[in-house]
Each structure stands twice: as C-alpha cells, then as structure tokens.
Amino acid sequence: MNIRYESCLTERYVQSFINNIAFPKSLEELRYFIDEHGCYNVENILFEDETNWTCPKWAKVGDIVFFMHSKTAKATITKLRTCLNSSRCDYSDSEFEEMMSWINRGLELYKRYGGKIFAVGVVAGLPEYFDDQKETIYHWNSPIYCDIVNVVKLRNPIHISKFNSFITVSRQSGITPVFGEEFDKLKCLISKKNTIPEFLRLSISSSLPLSKKQ
C-alpha cells in the first residue's frame, strides 16, 4: 500500500462514511472466499490495521471510515445454509463440511458484530477506480477503492438501533455518508462506550459534499 496519510495532533475538518460489510450472497461466492481469501471481509477488518477498501468517490485523505457488519447478513447466512443442505449431493464430504464450517463461522461473527459499527479507520489515499470489478463474483459492485489505515477495533461495538434514529443506513449501497450533526452524535455515542482513537477525537465534521450519492 502506498500510504499518504500523516496523523496530526490538532483538530481537523473531515468527511466521514459508514462502510456496511455484507455477507457472500451465493455458495459460489462463498467458495471463492474460501479458496482465494481465506477469511471473510469482516475478519479482514478485525485482523488488519490497514487495508484497501471500497469508498465514495468524494473521499479525501484524512476522512473517517466507520466499519459496520450488515444487519441483513443473518438472513443471507440462513439462506446459504439451506442451499448447501439442499445441494448436499453436489459436494464431497470434505467440501461440504468445510463450507458448512464457514457458514457456522459466519453466523458466530454475526452474533458478535451483526448490525454493529465495530471498527473505525482513516482514509490514507485518494480514491482509485478499478474497471475489472465486473469480472468478479463479489457481492459488492463498487469499483472505487482507497487505502485505509489506523483501523481500530471498538471494544464495545455500536448496534444500529442506537443510531438509526439520526442516521439512515443505505440499503442500495454499501456506503452511507455521515455529516454534520449525524457525525457529532455518532462520535459521541461511540465515545460513551469506547476509548476512541485520537484521530477520531480530534475530527470535526466538514460541510456536506456536492452530492451524498456515491
């Protein structure tokens, strides 16, 4: 990663967004994650301090990213378990057991993080466009990515029920912009339950960009 973000110890104006991480939508995609990634997207954020991740095209260096595990993931997990059981004869014993183990692991992740903001990070590079995204089977379709660093896991993740009265998490996109009073309230909510990192404590929400649409 070509990191271009330098932290500072003074208050700064930022934009921010929630990155809502979903679950693989099909058995084919689940198989792809097993073979090519070795972990779920949520685990990638949990285990790494920096990453290259989807972002809005208006993201700037220093902006704040709130990582959330999709509330709807449980329904997807249940559907995949049903599909796997119904197509049992299509898999060898070892492959079936491996895929079922992954589904069960996904359910455990959901029980702990589902519908919750569980980590926060900082945009470290300008958005970049990858036009080969259409060739993949990923459950997300955004071709825009940026480097994200200083990923901090929250000791006490924040459930959507605590902030959906003032933030409407997008159902059409994995990205939900968070600005102005929304940012202030979410930051306050997180800080009541967690020791927040310095970069979040010193962040002040900037004005709304030209469009809230990614």
Place the predicted regions along the sequence by residue.
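Compositionally biased, charged N-terminal/linker segments
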Residues: 1-61, 66-101, 165-166, 178, ...
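Aromatic- and Lys/Arg-enriched surface recognition patch
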Residues: 83, 88-188
